[in-house]
Structure formats: C-alpha cells, structure tokens
C-alpha cells in the first residue's frame, strides 16, 4: 500500500492499510515514508499498525511534496526511519528500498553502496525500484557482499490488482 507516492497526500493510507489487513487473507505491506514526519507521528503510526496486527513495513525516505514546498519533519534519511522502527518494540518484518542504478541523491557510487549496506544491515530485506538491466542488480548484490552485507535484496516487480 503506497504512502504519499509522488509527494501526494497520505491522509488515508494508515486507515486503508489497517482495513486491508483486517479484511483480506493475504499479508499487507505498509509503505511508510519519513519525509515530512516527526518522530512522534511515526511512533503513533507504528502503534496503530502494531495494534491492528500489521506485520510488514517497507521503510522509505519518500518523495518531496509535488508542489516543491519544504516538507518539514525531523528525518533526513530512511536510515533514521529504520532505526526508529527497530527501536519501537513491535516485531515488524522490515524492508527498505534499494536502487541498482544508484539513489538519485547519492553523490557517488561508493557512498551510495555504503549507505545502502548500512540501511540493509538494520532490515530484513531490500526491495529494488524497477530496473531494466539484470546485470545492474547482480552487480549491486556483489558490491554489497564485498562490504559484508548479505541481507537479501529482491528485484522489484509490479503486480496490478484493484481491491
């Protein structure tokens, strides 16, 4: 369940995630972005998800607002969100984003892989954005292994389903 994709509103996402988790016989993975959030807001969402039995979270940095305004909030990077989720106490299955072709905000290749390895070290798995060359994914996994990171990184695919 996406959360503020493209900088859009995320007002109903938690309610929809909780409803889908309760009403369907398949696991729901809540996307949770940190952009524009305070720590207390995220803790409140995590409390709601834990209380409702939501077990899976994909922790993301998130897109800036579509209008280009300052999103505010207390987070700068997804690693900070992952740390907060791990400290929460609920036993969420926690995924993070990975970009085989490098994160758009990365200053260079080496720092991109170091930050990704750090983020993955706190997660259960990584999930990539879409990519077209499978060699990019294979190279990323090799580079992460060279850094001592062996957390699984799954190729992202798009499944279309309307509920």
Where are these regions (language model features)?
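Hydrophobic faces of well-ordered beta-strands that scaffold small-molecule active sites
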Residues: 1, 28-32, 57-59, 94-98, ...
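Active-site-proximal loop/turn and secondary-structure-junction residues that shape catalytic pockets
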Residues: 3-7, 34-36, 61-65, 98-102, ...
């Amino acid at each position: 369940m996406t959360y503020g994709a493209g900088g859009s509103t995320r007002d109903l996402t938690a309610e929809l995630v909780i409803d889908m988790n309760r009403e369907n016989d398949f696991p729901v993975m809540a996307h949770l972005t940190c952009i524009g959030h305070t720590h207390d807001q995220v803790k409140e969402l995590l409390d709601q998800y834990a209380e409702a039995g939501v077990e899976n979270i994909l922790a993301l940095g998130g897109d800036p607002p579509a209008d280009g305004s300052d999103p505010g909030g207390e987070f700068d990077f997804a690693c900070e969100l992952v740390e907060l989720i791990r400290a929460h106490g609920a036993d969420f299955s926690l995924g993070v984003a990975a970009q085989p072709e490098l994160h758009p905000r990365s200053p260079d290749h080496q720092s991109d892989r170091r930050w990704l390895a750090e983020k993955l070290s706190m997660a259960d798995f990584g999930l990539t954005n879409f990519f077209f060359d499978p060699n990019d994914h294979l190279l990323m996994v090799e580079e992460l292994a060279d850094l001592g990171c062996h957390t699984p990184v799954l190729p992202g695919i798009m499944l279309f389903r309307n509920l």
